[in-house]
Amino acid sequence: MAKEREKKVLIVGAGPAGLTAAYELLKKTDLQPVVFEASNVIGGISQTVKYHGNRMDIGGHRFFSKNKEVMEWWTKLMPVQGSNSCDDIILGNTDKELNIGGPDPEKEDRVILVRHRVSRIFFLRKFFDYPISLKLSTFTNMGLLHTIKSGYGFFVSMIHKLPETSLENFYINRFGKHLYSLFFEGYTEKVWGIHPSELGADWGSQRVKGISLWAVIIDMIRKKLGKKSVDKTETSLIEQYIYPKYGPGQLWEYVASEIQKEGGEIIMDAEVVKIHVTNNQVTSIDYRNADGIITNRTGDYLFSTMPIKDLVNALTDIDVPINIKRIAHELPYRDFITVGLCVKKLKIENETHIKTYKNRIPDTWIYIQERDVKIGRLQIFNNWSPYLVNDYKNTMWIGLEYFCSEGDELWEMQKDEFIKMAIDELVKIDIIEKEDVIDACQVKIKKAYPSYYGSYYELDKVKEYFDNIINLYCLGRNGQHRYNNMDHSMLTAMRAVDAIIKGNNDKQAIWAVNTEDNYHETK
């Protein structure tokens, strides 16, 4: 067993940011990480849920980053496959770049797969490319009138730019008014629960980045000319990603085991309820276990990935200004419910050029833009990794994703009633037949998505207040109230460890992660 180190870093949360921080501290410093996880599950929103032999990725996590440090981190812990996975063996596929000498996924579990990325929009009971492409099928599916209106709207948006004071204007500037109203307006309201005119453009700049109809045109020309550049191609247009054999939770569970092997401590069912601060420094935390027992732990640093409103509520022995409390309390979030369905087959079939088993659709996820149903996205777990599915050859394992707010009608609905509604919605839009449903489960995630409205616009005041607490570092999606991808959450942890190593109390490099204009993977 590794020797315990003298100085302690208290880490709130065993998601990607918290676990990355703990791992990096053990590898690069003489500090002892102690991780407190409120639930009994490793991985946060990047967990993998197991149900009757099937595995469900909550929200879908493509492993892709423009940051080489992150890519190398992933593939060092979980090497890239050196032989074909079972689905490629069945189909006789030989089109993937395998890692010579890498593990065989048919024989080994600690392996990361190379996967093709296919995401599409389902609208008007038809499939559209995501992002919207200029293929003939797009215009055929839209019809002549929508095509003319879309072309005119895009032309107007090229010569008349709106002030980007809202997400609505952000989208109109990039796609034109009519395409926005068709493909973005209703879906965005479904996801966030408010109209895009009330959402900040920040979300678009962080999630959509440089994607626009013009970017799609340039990418199409680049492909025609045979030119490919990862650095210059928008990340939403990159066509492959890597993915752990058993989903993201497998990687994070492995990281957790490595942390413990190296002497780090991970305490599960440990809800941090108080953070003691003296002379602008965190001195200790109180956590409550599953039996309700409160325990105090001292530390030299605190890395927090907990929601900002919970962090402010937990601050003790310090006079938190009323305005800071108000801003934190009013920060908006969007919650998330997934229904896992095991079905015999889907009604919709593969009409793409991509070869698939039993002619199944090739998509990893589908954006459901239909306005007569509440479902937001549909995951096809067979296509993420065939090893997520207990009976890959004979069943389809899918995830029906709903965006909601804690306490609203969807959130409060009884589980059986919710599952019935979800099944009925897929039947309604002709994706499944009810009699093909074999099994179902439901998973609910609180505060899955930080939202960009309300007191979010005053968040800088809270950041400034936190930065005055010398040894407090806010990391990850909820820790920074920023809609990060997994790699960004990891980078906040890496930058925090760098700051400690350098003895640098300036936390700007940590807050600055995910502010670059060309960073995101969103397809």
Label every model-predicted segment:
Residues K7-V35:
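N-terminal Rossmann-like FAD-binding beta1-loop-alpha1 element of flavoenzymes
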Residues A17, V41, K309:
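Conserved Rossmann-like nucleotide-cofactor binding loop
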Residues E265-I267, I438-C441, Y473:
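General small-molecule cofactor/ligand-binding pocket signal
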Residues L26-Y51:
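Glycine-rich FAD pyrophosphate-binding loop
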Residues V443, Y452-K523:
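C-terminal lid/capping helical subdomain adjacent to the catalytic/cofactor pocket in oxidative enzymes
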Residues H52-M158:
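Dinucleotide-binding Rossmann-like beta1-alpha1 core, especially the glycine-rich loop
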Residues L136-T138, M142-G143, T147-T278, T283, ...:
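Active-site/ligand-binding neighborhood in enzyme catalytic cores
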Residues K28, M268-E412, D416, K420-D430, ...:
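Mid-domain catalytic core of redox enzymes
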